[in-house]
A protein has these predicted regions:
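Aromatic/histidine-rich interaction motifs
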Residues: 102-129
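Short, Lys/Arg-enriched N-terminal segment that forms or immediately precedes the first helix
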Residues: 31, 161-169
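N-terminal regulatory/effector-sensing and dimerization cores
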Residues: 15-109
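Basic/polar phosphate-binding segments, predominantly the helix-turn-helix DNA-binding elements
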Residues: 159-163, 191, 195-213
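A short, N-terminal "cap"/entry segment at the start of jelly-roll beta-barrel domains
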Residues: 1-17, 135-138
């Protein structure tokens, strides 16, 4: 059977390679990322260490080894590594982690947590993350492989975590991704002027400026 790679074994230079959405990062003790507005949705899995995080959902929360949180696009997030921290970030734009039926069910039938707490990394999720570390270290990755890993993560979260657990992921996603700020963050690089951005979103320029203020 002929190779689909057509003899090109350098995956980083393959035409099918895309930006990697799964990143393995180690922060040294004392590393501080000031409060900033997230330009992507991401799930932060803390494999080792302790990290102090601060956001609207996780105000002054100590994230410990074996826990994870989600931060939605447009939300403000700050972090401080209390010890050396080993992390895996999974970044995404659209909430592809759930089927529409499950997402809508949680939105309608399951209330958001009164107090948000990090979720535990169960063994099945740990296996997925350990496997991801071993061969997803490059800046780029095969498009088909990344698609499979997205689906695998979606399956693990959807199959092994309850609706109540997933509510702490779904509700922030819905809150931020349906908003005006999310639209601006996702699209401002695609245009050159405010007028073009307003037109892209179906706004009149006066309405766009009023909402943006």
């Amino acid at each position: 059977m002929p190779s689909i790679c057509q003899g090109n074994w350098d995956c980083q230079n393959c035409p099918k390679a895309v930006g990697n959405a799964i990143a393995h990062i180690i922060y040294q003790r004392g590393f501080h990322r000031p409060a900033h507005k997230c330009e992507e949705n991401f799930i932060l899995f803390l494999m080792k260490g302790e990290m102090l995080v601060n956001s609207q959902e996780y105000a002054g929360t100590m994230l410990r080894e074996g826990e994870f949180i989600l931060q939605a696009i447009g939300s403000k997030f700050e972090m401080l590594a209390m010890t050396e921290c080993e992390c895996i970030y999974y970044r995404f734009v659209q909430p592809e982690l759930f089927c529409d039926l499950r997402f809508n069910h949680i939105m309608k039938e399951v209330s958001p947590p009164l107090i948000y707490s990090p979720l535990k990394i169960i063994p099945e999720l740990q296996y997925f993350l350990n496997g991801s570390i071993t061969y997803l270290k490059g800046d780029k990755v095969c498009r088909e492989l990344l698609s499979l890993k997205r689906k695998e993560l979606a399956f693990v979260l959807g199959y092994y975590y309850s609706d109540y657990d997933l509510a702490s992921l779904v509700h922030p996603l819905s809150k931020y991704t349906n908003g005006f700020q999310c639209f601006v963050i996702q699209n401002y690089k695609k245009v050159k002027t405010v007028e073009e951005l307003a037109q892209l979103g179906g706004y009149t320029i006066s309405t766009f400026r009023r909402i943006f203020q």
